[in-house]
């Protein structure tokens, strides 16, 4: 599709769609709890709909009533053996978290995904789950999907130190540990998003967190809850950056999730000198209103424990860095290589084709700014975040056009993205 270019300023207020991570987990916890869980403001992107359909395939009644989703939970012991392969679509979150759920079941199930997901390694979850007594069969030594999981209702507890910072691996192990015969200890490499831990407590579960150590008791029962899903800061990130780099812009985003494990992008914006304000903070839902406006920006360094707090925002942060004076260095982000695409290479290729100066490295990028961007043809390779990054970059292009191939990938997390862009551009 041909993208909007040469924007004269973006102005207005938006409510971004519900948080993808919390939406996934609300369906999983709601299915595993006893009683009817009510979820407000859930994201209706393709990934979350995949999770919803997978639990329906395992016998969970889920009613979508528009603003409200009702999940008739059946407990860990109430799931039914699926009659067909469980299709995770493009969702690595679905596959990894649900693998932990399947680990303790008394049936076998096959998990499949699309072409992109079928290239993503699952050995990071299969190795610890096998240690708990689960039989898992994948493709190649990296356990690429399809994955067949033969559940074990007598799971052994595990003591496991994560070799990488991954909320998905941590969460898979928590879901497995909840079904094990005793207490498990999970030790993080770096602190990652803690939505699973927060929601486990909300649903009446028990765990103890001490720094990077998480202790989870086995054979727990969960109780249905009412969940309000805040807006997704990963989706908000595209408008935050657009508001900073498109001249004559001022954008206000309401009800944005500000869980402390997810707000790394706000730290980066402030370090770069961006004009940003946070107001109307809701301490219960962990949400706030965030306003940004066009700013003079300066390069910075992004590395270490900051990386897990903004891993999904790094593509759009790379664009932000192209519009900052001086050098921006991104390190310790090798996890980007096993996302929907190799995001280090694909981001560099896409933005360099538009005139940026980005050198990909083994674990990140070296970005020189400030650069003028020009027209180009860019392929998403099925990666929603590459698509949205390119659409924001195109707004700065004064000469030439920007063609985006496979733009439909954006529906994975933000079906209304282009409608919201038009709202801001036409004020």
Swiss-Prot record:
Belongs to the EPSP synthase family. One of its GO terms (molecular function) is 3-phosphoshikimate 1-carboxyvinyltransferase activity. Pathway: Metabolic intermediate biosynthesis; chorismate biosynthesis; chorismate from D-erythrose 4-phosphate and phosphoenolpyruvate: step 6/7. Catalyzes the transfer of the enolpyruvyl moiety of phosphoenolpyruvate (PEP) to the 5-hydroxyl of shikimate-3-phosphate (S3P) to produce enolpyruvyl shikimate-3-phosphate and inorganic phosphate. Its EC number is 2.5.1.19. InterPro entries: Enolpyruvate_Tfrase_dom, Enolpyruvate_Tfrase_sf, EPSP_synthase, EPSP_synthase_CS, RNA3'P_cycl/enolpyr_Trfase_a/b. It is found in: Cytoplasm. CDD domains: EPSP_synthase. This is 3-phosphoshikimate 1-carboxyvinyltransferase. Phosphoenolpyruvate binds at residues 20, 92, 120, 168, 343, 385. It is an enzyme of class 2 (transferase). GO terms for cellular component: cytoplasm. 3-phosphoshikimate binds at residues 20-21, 25, 166, 168, 312, 339. One of its GO terms (biological process) is amino acid biosynthetic process. It catalyses: 3-phosphoshikimate + phosphoenolpyruvate = 5-O-(1-carboxyvinyl)-3-phosphoshikimate + phosphate. Keywords: Amino-acid biosynthesis, Aromatic amino acid biosynthesis, Cytoplasm, Transferase. The active site is at 312 (proton acceptor). Its main location: cytoplasm. Monomer.
């Amino acid at each position: 599709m041909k993208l909007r270019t040469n924007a004269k300023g973006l102005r207005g207020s938006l409510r971004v769609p519900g948080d993808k991570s919390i939406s996934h987990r609300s369906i999983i916890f709601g299915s595993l709890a006893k009683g009817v869980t009510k979820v407000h403001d859930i994201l209706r992107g393709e990934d979350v709909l995949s999770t919803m359909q997978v639990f329906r395939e395992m016998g969970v009644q889920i009613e979508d009533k528009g603003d409200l989703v009702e999940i008739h939970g059946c407990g860990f012991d109430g799931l039914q053996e699926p009659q067909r392969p469980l299709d995770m679509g493009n969702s690595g979150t679905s596959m990894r978290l649900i693998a932990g759920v399947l680990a303790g079941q008394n049936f076998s199930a096959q998990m499949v995904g699309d072409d992109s997901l079928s290239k993503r390694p699952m050995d990071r979850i299969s190795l610890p789950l096998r240690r708990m007594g689960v039989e898992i069969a994948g493709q190649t030594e990296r356990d690429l999907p399809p994955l067949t999981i033969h559940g074990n209702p007598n799971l052994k507890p595990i003591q496991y130190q994560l070799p990488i910072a991954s909320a998905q691996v941590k969460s898979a192990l928590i879901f497995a540990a909840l079904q094990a015969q005793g207490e498990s200890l999970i030790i993080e490499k770096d602190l990652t998003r803690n939505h699973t831990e927060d929601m486990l407590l909300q649903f009446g579960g028990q765990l103890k967190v001490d720094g990077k150590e998480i202790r989870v008791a086995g054979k727990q029962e969960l109780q249905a809850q009412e969940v309000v899903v805040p807006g997704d800061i990963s989706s908000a990130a595209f408008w935050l950056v657009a508001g900073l780099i498109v001249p004559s812009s001022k954008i206000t985003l309401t009800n944005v999730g500000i869980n402390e494990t997810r707000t790394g992008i706000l730290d980066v914006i402030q370090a770069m000198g961006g004009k940003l304000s946070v107001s109307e903070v809701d301490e219960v839902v962990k949400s706030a209103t965030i306003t940004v406006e066009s700013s003079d920006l300066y390069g910075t360094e992004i590395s270490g424990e900051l990386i897990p707090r903004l891993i999904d925002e790094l593509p759009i942060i790379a664009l932000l860095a192209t519009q900052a004076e001086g050098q921006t260095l991104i390190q310790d982000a090798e996890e980007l290589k096993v996302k929907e695409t190799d995001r280090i290479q694909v981001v560099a290729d896409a933005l360099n084709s538009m005139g940026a100066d980005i050198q990909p490295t083994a674990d990140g990028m070296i970005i020189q700014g400030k650069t003028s961007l020009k027209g180009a043809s860019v392929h998403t390779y099925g990666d929603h975040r590459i698509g949205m990054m390119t659409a924001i970059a195109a707004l700065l292009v004064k000469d030439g056009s920007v063609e985006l191939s496979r733009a439909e990938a954006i529906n994975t997390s933000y079906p209304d993205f282009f409608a919201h862009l038009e709202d801001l551009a036409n004020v």
